[in-house]
Amino acid sequence: MAFSFGQQGSSIKAPSIGSTGVFGQSNTTKPTAPFGSGSIFGSTNTNVGAGGPTGSSSAPPFGNSIFGKTQQQPTTSFSNTTTNAPQSTVFGQNAASRTGNSNTQPLFSWSTVNNPTKPVDETNATIPSSLLLSSGISPNATVSNAQYGPAQPPSVEEQVQKILNAWNLNHPDCAFQRFFYNKVPVEQAALYVKPPNYNQQKWDEAVANRPSNSVVPVLAVGFPDVQKRINMQIQQVNTYRIRMREIVETLGRLSNKHDLDFSIKLAEAKNRHVRLSERILRLAIKVHVLRHRGYALKPNEEELRKKLDDLTKSLNNPEIFGRLNEIWARITLIFEGEKISEDQRSNLAKGVVDWRKNSDQLEVITDVLRDHQVGLSYVVKLMQEDLATLNKQLTEHVPQSQK
């Protein structure tokens, strides 16, 4: 006795000999029930009798599906001929035709039935309920896409979700992911392992593509991480600049200390070396003279003595001292000329002299002009005297020639 939503089902008769179906189920024949006293929505579920010699069957007047649609089992006979009846799905529609066409449904999944009118969309097709019940498969199972055609393209919802995941910084499929590298000591690089929230494949690729063994990959997700890395690099560069400035200042202090301490000590050591060299040379001269006292000079020593005598005479020559004084005077004039500023030199080159600032030069020029004036006066006086003498002689000579 079966109940469906509170209604009493129809009674089932005992099976007779030879009344088994194709898959071994017992096909029972139920009496025709009146309208409204059957299945879930008021219809009576009846099975077509099988195994009889004539293959006769009885059908209910209103069908046996959940929504009142007719569901029939194939009728078999001893001649192994099978007549396919239209199969109905859970929602009362024929599995072979969803568009209104009455097509036959193959019994097994590898059997194919050609539809001359319109291809059936088998992507989401459900397996017939009778076949699932006989094979032990759940009626809610769907046919795989590999058996009934290629997979359908992703839906709009899946595409939108994929785009959302690509922009979500906390999702593993985020598109804004980039591995950077941090430099660490070589002995510590092997101690770094993959963090728990990193992708193993991407981590292995980053480790394989690192430029050297002294760097480790670091994942940056999105623009905030890139900005953090830029700020850290700027901070590190500023730290390096501060350190470089400290190094330059330290080098400056060491250089000043070297110039003040070691340079002075080096100059003192050089002077001491020169004094010691002179003392050693004088000592060597005295030792050599004492060793060869009373001995005749050798030819080379005699030549050296003559050269030394000549040098002594040249040093004591007064002409040399006069020449030295002249050279010293020229050097003094050169030094004095260097003391004149560049402006004064340019003014002198242009002929412009600031007499208020160059009183010494004015006195020098005055003295030179005075000397020139005296010289010119003397020349004029000589010329006048010579002219008077010439005129006198000419005067005396002309009368004598006339006489």
From Swiss-Prot:
Localization per Swiss-Prot or TrEMBL: Cytoplasm; Nucleus
Record-linked InterPro entries: Nup54/Nup57/Nup44, Nup54_alpha-helical_dom
The protein's name: Nucleoporin nup44
Chain segments annotated as transmembrane: none
Alphabetically ordered keywords of this record: Cytoplasm, Nucleus, Transport
GO molecular function (one): structural constituent of nuclear pore
Species of origin: Schizosaccharomyces pombe (strain 972 / ATCC 24843) (Fission yeast)
UniProt keyword RNA-binding present: no
Ranges annotated as biased composition (Polar residues): 1-31, 67-124
One of the GO biological process terms: nuclear pore organization
GO cellular component, one term: nucleus
Its biological purpose: Functions as a component of the nuclear pore complex (NPC). NPC components, collectively referred to as nucleoporins (NUPs), can play the role of both NPC structural components and of docking or interaction partners for transiently associated nuclear transport factors. Active directional transport is assured by both, a Phe-Gly (FG) repeat affinity gradient for these transport factors across the NPC and a transport cofactor concentration gradient across the nuclear envelope.
Main location (coarse class): cytoplasm
Region of interest (Disordered), residue spans: 1-124
Domain of life: Eukaryota
Signal peptide stretch: none
